[in-house]
């Protein structure tokens, strides 16, 4: 046997053993080795230690680490950090006892001085700008580390641009003063040193170090007395003093001849500490606001442990559980959602069942088979009318129709069979079919066969109804399903193989009749709680200029109530975070994530991993609700785009229906799918409900802004900081900042959940769905028209009506339908583009009497005006006689359009008449539905009065609100063009009746009660009570309420608001102080209300918004007018002085505007300053991807060259980025004149336009402008004082009912100068009351009572009329812009102002309308007959006009005015011009007559 002997070779030593002396030599050699080439010892250096020594320092914690840190000088690290490495090497060599260090050759003092002098001479020979800061890179890094946290651009601008700009003269004066101070402080040793030299800088640097050490000692002594400030002091010494020491180059550049004294350095340190204190206070305030959030996170941290489990462990195998059947073999199923696929061939119902094994509700889906399509065919009439046909003739007609239909079926081989039979149905809609009962042929065939085209025509039938009806809609209507409810499922079959959904349980039903609505459920009586996942995301921009998901935080709540408020305090949360491309993560981020106990954070290297984890979490949690703010406005589209781009597997787990391919159609509402179910977010999430709090807030509350920050503030009383995705990379510098970002994202998700709960979105939309009978997901999408449509479909289906088909939309109509919510009733404009002119007039707007009212104004409003009109006059499709508007193919009838004046088509709607309101027709569906809703709401409100349980009271409040919303929106489906129940004739009739009702109310208020109506809009009026007593004003409102309400049965007006004071500017624009709780005197309080005054637009700078807000607050303050004027004078003067002195910070002038397309696509940038700035930034090296779709900040400036200032007229030449202004060093300064004239004066002018005692001239003078330019506007307002000029512009009270409608037009009043006493007065008319209760003739002077001679009066009137004619033919036009006021009689094109830069319109100063109004006014002054007709008192006294004093004189004066009126072409209506086209010899080129 051979043995193998193993020979082991002697191994080499892995570690080398040396003694202490040799190890110290190695360490010293490391310290002396400059391992950075050409660094000269100023950069990095090796401390000589080992790697494990540094690691131990990092990981060492507890008392041992603290003890080690206290053994050395606390300033040593700072000194070592700031001093060059060469200096540290010298210190180390001098202190070391290493012999090798002492063996180096010594350099004498003289040699050292020579070397240093040579170095300094070389440095002094260079210009200061050529010298580089050796610590520049380190300085930039420290600045980045210590930059204050900014979540949005506004905070970033405030941090960067919260500086005061100095003018060039101020800089020069400051430098001269500093040079004198420097010369006085320069010592003898430094008298020959160049102030720009490095030696000088080194001396200053070392002095700063000494001062910083002294400051360190002082701060330590302070910290002993105030332990709470220790952390702040350490922060100040450890960070900001570094910045002071490092930034020596910048200090020298700004102050070239300054020597930093100890006092100045101490002042600088004090200033820095003050800034730190302010920053710390702000941080403490923010932490105080977030205390509730942090406590909640800590409380819910234990629930997050479930989310840390393995994915497979979290998902148990629920599908193996048996179905929880009832004793009778049925299944109790709670309906939540439904969806159809393959054109209705596959119908899925989603809901929840109670799984006993799990002791909770789990998701379940039902695949419904056996659906049938139903079509109704209308036979064609020939000869006889339907009413005259006999039964046999109807049968023969039906037989012929069925024979032809069989031939039609054979043309479609996919439809193998169907069944037909004649039935009787009703019709009452817009096709040319007589309203009433008719015979139809009903067709039924299996839903797996394709649908029949609705355009099929035949010889024996007119059209086919129901061809494009979706199977889901048919299922809902036939099974009478009205929203989420319990169902009883008979014969359920559990699906185990080839499952089509991701639900925990899946069943199959062979016949839809096996599904029935049940009220008494055998399994569970309460409604199942819903599970919600509320998420918020943070995005970043990729190098390809695409949005990517960087962070995603979710709040999971498994107990969302369907009937009332939910308990959302208890929840789970998790955050998914990934690394940014090209951006390193902070040090030890993984351990920091693991140690974060109050949050569950998962980190991923790539976006793909993050999204896959999110999809997996959705599948595991199986939520019923997916909640986010602005979810449907781009967030979900982004998520799906990234899923498609990254090819995420099992992406359909976001929903509950299994799919292979992501749908690529944006929307397809023209198809048969219910509710436009081809919308992509709906396609991928069917089975789950999408809750977008942005959309629901727009539906449920009225706010000026619907972003999360504003809604959290006004609805939740919570502060939120806006976040700008462009600043996302700045948070990846430190873990503290990254945790702030994570916390911000998690809090966004929680605020969204709070908002959903506060607005009661889930219970309210459920009630709306239960009332209307539509799908819940459509109610969550604010499909108001669809809710009303489904409600009417249920009602008309119940009454055996043939339902109108869904309109087939083309691409153009589809685009309109997507923005259907932007349409207004009776208005022809949309946000998305143009459409035909308004088909009918909308609500009436009474012209406002603009001005400031310092007494109580009452706002009275009709309760649900349009629904009440429908009930009051019994308006319905079946009661209003109207002509048909559509052909059988669904197209509009041609007679619906006529040519307008501009050649465009206008809809010509027949004015329908009101039906007989005393006739009660049983088929009047609209009034019946509204009446039923009103009765239900009344019953709910009566129950609320006696209910004491807060939970039940909240549920009742939600139900009554849902009923109110449904009733108020019922009118909308009539005027909505895409609605199946579109009936413009009925809608026009309702709005016309509404206008008549408002006018009737106005007439009662003014003529019967003598009230002053100052404004009215659609269903409300404002009344000036003339009183400051609240109870007295309310009594006036009650009087009007009683007079109006007694005229109607259903219409009712109520006091809706009481304004203590009102600033009424124009239509839909006012501000007021409003009484709240005015019916309860003990609880009355005054709040400010604004409508239409938009002060948040980005094209107004912060200074403009601040000034406008102050002016408005002063006007509404209730102070005396003199005090308001003094306050405004002081405030505006201070603003003007600050602008002149340049003490306003730069961020107050910043205007932002978005770049919406590629910069090269902008053709003309002269009037677009943001584009000019963006173009300049692009030329400076910024990529276009960083500019497009971003908001560009800019300020308007003027350039300064020496003593001259260059100011261009083009805004593009005057616009600068804030960074450019700062770096210009005084060469570019703010153009204060532009800001005053463009940003400050216009908004102030609009606010004070109707305030007496405050003129534009006064405001311009306060702001430092030339008041002469604005004197015209002041004179234009003060026209009440008579002058020698007989033409005085004013608003006289006209004398006839016809002319009363003209009282808002300016006319020229007749002014008479008495020939006896030379007194000027307005001619008063026929008779005027005197002080002793006697009547005086208008031909007597109001002062001396002397009779005016007839010849003098006639001559004065003749001169007045000639001057009036001369003013008209002068053709003067004036600009309507307040700051322009240009007048000219030049011939203008498009009536645009001729002043360069002004965008105002030029209007005629004396137009034809104004001249005609003046003539009619004058004719009324001398018309005795008209005077007696209008004045009953004088009519009784003077039985005949001839008995009135001076009758002949007035008659002659009237003839003179009538002679001018006859000459006026404007006063005539030439019927020949109007109807001349009907005559054969008509001349189409007749010239228009002149006014005179």
Curated annotation (Swiss-Prot):
Example GO BP: leading strand elongation
Nucleotidyltransferase keyword on record: yes
Chain spans, region Disordered: 34-112, 162-195, 210-234
SUPFAM superfamilies: DNA/RNA polymerases, Ribonuclease H-like
Residues annotated to bind Zn(2+) 2: 1375, 1380, 1393, 1398
Keywords of this entry: DNA replication, DNA-binding, DNA-directed DNA polymerase, Metal-binding, Nucleotidyltransferase, Nucleus, Transferase, Zinc, Zinc-finger
Pfam families linked to this entry: DNA_pol_alpha_N, DNA_pol_B, DNA_pol_B_exo1, zf-DNA_Pol
GO molecular function annotation: chromatin binding; DNA replication origin binding; DNA-directed DNA polymerase activity; nucleotide binding; single-stranded DNA binding; zinc ion binding
Subcellular location: Nucleus
Zinc finger (CysA-type): 1314-1344
Sequence motif CysB motif, location on chain: 1375-1398
Binding site for Zn(2+) 1: 1314, 1317, 1341, 1344
Keyword Nucleus: yes
Comment field (misc): In eukaryotes there are five DNA polymerases: alpha, beta, gamma, delta, and epsilon which are responsible for different reactions of DNA synthesis.
Reported function: Polymerase alpha in a complex with DNA primase is a replicative polymerase.
Record-linked NCBIfam families: pol2
Stated name of the protein: DNA polymerase alpha catalytic subunit
Species annotation: Sterkiella nova
């Amino acid at each position: 046997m051979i043995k193998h002997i193993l020979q082991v070779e002697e191994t080499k030593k892995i570690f080398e053993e040396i003694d202490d002396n040799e190890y110290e030599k190695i360490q010293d050699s490391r310290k002396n080795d400059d391992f950075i080439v050409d660094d000269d010892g100023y950069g990095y250096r090796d401390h000589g230690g080992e790697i494990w020594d540094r690691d131990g320092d990092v990981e060492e914690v507890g008392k041992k680490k603290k003890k080690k840190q206290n053994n050395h000088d606390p300033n040593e690290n700072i000194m070592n950090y700031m001093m060059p490495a060469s200096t540290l090497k010298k210190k180390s060599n001098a202190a070391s006892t290493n012999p090798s260090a002492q063996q180096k050759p010594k350099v004498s003092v003289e040699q050292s001085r020579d070397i240093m002098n040579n170095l300094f001479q070389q440095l002094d020979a260079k210009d200061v700008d050529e010298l580089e800061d050796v610590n520049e890179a380190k300085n930039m890094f420290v600045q980045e580390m210590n930059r204050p946290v900014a979540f949005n651009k506004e905070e970033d601008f405030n941090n960067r641009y919260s500086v005061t700009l100095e003018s060039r003269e101020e800089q020069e004066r400051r430098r001269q003063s500093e040079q004198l101070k420097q010369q006085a402080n320069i010592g003898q040793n430094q008298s020959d040193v160049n102030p720009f030299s490095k030696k000088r800088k080194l001396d200053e640097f070392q002095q700063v170090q000494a001062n910083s050490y002294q400051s360190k000692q002082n701060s330590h002594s302070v910290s002993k007395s105030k332990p709470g400030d220790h952390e702040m002091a350490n922060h100040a010494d450890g960070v900001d003093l570094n910045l002071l020491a490092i930034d020596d180059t910048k200090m020298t550049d700004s102050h070239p001849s300054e020597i930093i004294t100890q006092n100045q350095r101490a002042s600088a340190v004090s200033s820095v500490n003050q800034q730190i204190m302010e920053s710390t206070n702000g941080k403490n305030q923010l932490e105080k606001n977030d205390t509730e959030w942090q406590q909640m996170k800590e409380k819910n941290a234990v629930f997050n442990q479930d989310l840390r489990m393995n994915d497979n462990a979290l998902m148990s195998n629920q599908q193996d559980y048996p179905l929880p059947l009832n004793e009778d073999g049925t299944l109790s199923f709670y309906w939540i959602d439904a969806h159809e696929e393959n054109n209705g061939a596959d119908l899925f119902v989603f809901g929840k069942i109670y799984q006993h094994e799990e002791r909770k509700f789990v998701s379940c889906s039902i695949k419904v088979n056996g659906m049938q399509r139903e079509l109704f065919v209308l036979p064609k009439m020939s000869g006889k009318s339907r009413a005259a046909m006999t039964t046999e003739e109807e049968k023969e007609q039906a037989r012929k129709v069925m024979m032809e239909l069989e031939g039609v079926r054979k043309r479609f081989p996919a439809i193998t069979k169907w069944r037909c039979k004649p039935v009787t149905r009703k019709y009452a809609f817009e096709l040319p079919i007589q309203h009433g009962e008719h015979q139809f042929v009903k067709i039924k065939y299996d839903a797996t066969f394709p649908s029949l085209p609705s355009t099929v025509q035949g010889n024996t039938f007119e059209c086919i109804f129901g061809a494009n009806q979706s199977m889901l809609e048919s299922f809902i209507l036939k099974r009478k399903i009205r929203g989420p409810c319990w169902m009883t499922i008979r014969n359920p079959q559990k699906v185990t193989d080839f499952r089509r959904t991701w639900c925990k349980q899946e069943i199959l039903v062979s016949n839809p009749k096996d599904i029935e609505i049940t009220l008494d459920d055998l399994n569970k009586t309460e409604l199942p709680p819903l599970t919600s996942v509320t998420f918020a995301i943070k995005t970043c921009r990729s190098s390809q200029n695409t949005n990517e998901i960087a962070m995603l935080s979710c709040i999971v709540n498994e107990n969302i109530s369907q009937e009332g408020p939910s308990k959302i305090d208890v929840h789970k949360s998790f955050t998914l975070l990934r690394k940014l491309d090209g951006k390193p993560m902070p040090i030890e981020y993984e351990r920091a994530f693991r140690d974060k106990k109050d949050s569950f954070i998962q980190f991923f290297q790539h976006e793909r991993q993050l999204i896959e984890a999110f999809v997996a979490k959705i599948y595991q949690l199986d939520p019923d609700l997916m909640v986010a703010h602005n979810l449907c406005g781009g967030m979900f589209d982004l998520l799906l785009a990234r899923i498609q781009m990254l090819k995420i597997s099992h992406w359909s787990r976001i929903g509950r229906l299994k799919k292979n391919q992501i749908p690529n159609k944006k929307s397809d509402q023209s198809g048969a799918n219910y509710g436009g179910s081809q919308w992509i977010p709906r396609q991928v999430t069917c089975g789950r409900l999408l809750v977008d709090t942005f959309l629901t807030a727009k539906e449920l509350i009225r706010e000026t802004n619907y972003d999360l920050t504003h809604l959290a503030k006004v609805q939740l009383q919570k502060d939120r900081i806006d976040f700008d995705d462009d600043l996302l990379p700045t948070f990846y510098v430190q873990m503290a900042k990254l945790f702030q970002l994570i916390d911000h994202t998690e809090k966004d998700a929680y605020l969204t959940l709070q908002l959903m709960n506060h607005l009661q979105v889930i219970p309210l939309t459920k009630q709306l769905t239960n009332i209307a009978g539509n799908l819940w997901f459509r109610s969550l999408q604010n499909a108001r028209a669809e809710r009303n449509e489904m409600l009417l479909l249920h009602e008309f289906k119940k009454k055996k009506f043939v339902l109108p088909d869904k309109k087939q939309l083309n691409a153009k109509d589809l685009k309109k339908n997507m923005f259907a919510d932007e349409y207004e009733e009776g208005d022809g404009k949309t946000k998305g583009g143009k459409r035909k002119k308004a088909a009918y007039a909308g609500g009436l707007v009474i012209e406002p009497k603009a001005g400031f009212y310092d007494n109580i104004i009452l706002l009275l409003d009709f309760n649900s005006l349009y629904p009440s009109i429908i009930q009051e006059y019994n308006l319905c499709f079946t009661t209003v006689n109207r002509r048909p508007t559509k052909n059988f193919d669904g197209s509009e009838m041609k007679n619906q359009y006529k040519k307008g004046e501009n050649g465009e088509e206008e809809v010509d709607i027949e004015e329908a008449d009101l039906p007989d309101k005393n006739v009660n027709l049983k088929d009047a569906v609209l009034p019946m539905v509204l009446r039923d809703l009103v009765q239900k709401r009344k019953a709910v409100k009566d129950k609320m009065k006696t209910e004491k349980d807060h939970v039940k009271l909240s549920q009742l409040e939600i139900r009554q609100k849902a009923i109110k919303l449904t009733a108020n929106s019922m009118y909308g489906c009539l005027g909505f063009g895409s609605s199946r129940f579109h009936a413009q004739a009925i809608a026009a009739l309702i709005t016309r009746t509404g206008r008549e009702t408002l006018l009737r109310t106005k007439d009662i208020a003014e003529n019967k009660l003598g009230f002053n109506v100052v404004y009215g809009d659609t269903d409300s009026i404002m009344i000036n009570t003339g009183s400051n007593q609240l109870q007295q004003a309310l009594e006036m409102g009650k009087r009007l309420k009683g007079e109006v309400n007694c005229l109607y049965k259903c219409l009712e007006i109520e006091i809706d608001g009481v304004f203590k004071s009102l600033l009424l500017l124009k239509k839909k624009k006012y501000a007021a102080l409003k009484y709240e709780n005015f019916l309860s005197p003990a609880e009355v309080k005054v709040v400010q209300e604004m409508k239409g005054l938009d002060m948040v637009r980005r094209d107004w700078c912060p200074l403009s918004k601040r000034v406008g807000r102050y002016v408005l607050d002063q006007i509404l303050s209730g102070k005396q007018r003199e005090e308001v004027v003094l306050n405004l004078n002081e405030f505006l003067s201070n603003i003007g002085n600050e602008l002149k002195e340049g003490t306003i910070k730069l961020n107050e002038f910043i205007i932002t505007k978005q770049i919406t397309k590629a910069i090269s696509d902008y053709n003309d940038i002269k009037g677009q300053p943001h584009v000019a700035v963006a173009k300049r930034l692009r030329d400076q090296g910024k990529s276009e991807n960083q500019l497009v779709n971003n908001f560009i900040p800019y300020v308007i400036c003027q350039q300064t060259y020496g003593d001259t200032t260059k100011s261009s007229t083009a805004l593009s030449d005057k616009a600068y980025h804030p960074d450019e202004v700062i770096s210009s060093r005084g060469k570019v300064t703010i153009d204060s004149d532009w800001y005053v004239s463009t940003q400050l004066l216009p908004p102030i002018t609009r606010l004070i336009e109707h305030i007496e005692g405050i003129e534009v001239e006064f405001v311009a003078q306060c702001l430092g402008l030339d008041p002469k330019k604005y004197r015209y506007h002041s004179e234009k307002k003060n026209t009440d004082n008579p002058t020698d000029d007989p033409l005085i512009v004013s608003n006289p009270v006209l004398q006839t009912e016809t002319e009363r409608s003209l009282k808002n037009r300016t006319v020229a009043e007749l002014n008479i100068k008495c020939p006896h006493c030379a007194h000027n007065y307005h001619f008063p008319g026929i008779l005027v009351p005197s002080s002793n209760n006697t009547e005086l003739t208008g031909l007597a002077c109001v002062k001396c009572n002397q009779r005016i001679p007839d010849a003098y009066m006639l001559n004065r009137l003749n001169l007045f009329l000639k001057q009036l004619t001369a003013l008209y033919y002068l053709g003067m036009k004036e600009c309507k812009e307040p700051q322009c006021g240009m007048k000219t009689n030049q011939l203008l094109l498009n009536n645009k102002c001729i002043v360069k830069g002004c965008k105002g319109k030029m209007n005629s100063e004396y137009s034809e309308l104004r001249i005609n109004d003046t003539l009619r006014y004058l004719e009324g002054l001398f018309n005795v007959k008209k005077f007696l007709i209008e004045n009953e008192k004088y009519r009784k006294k003077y039985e005949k006009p001839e008995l009135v004093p001076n009758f002949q004189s007035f008659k002659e004066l009237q003839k003179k005015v009538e002679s001018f009126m006859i000459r006026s072409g404007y006063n005539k209506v030439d019927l020949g011009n109007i109807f001349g086209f009907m005559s054969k010899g008509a001349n189409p080129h007749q010239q228009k007559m002149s006014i005179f």
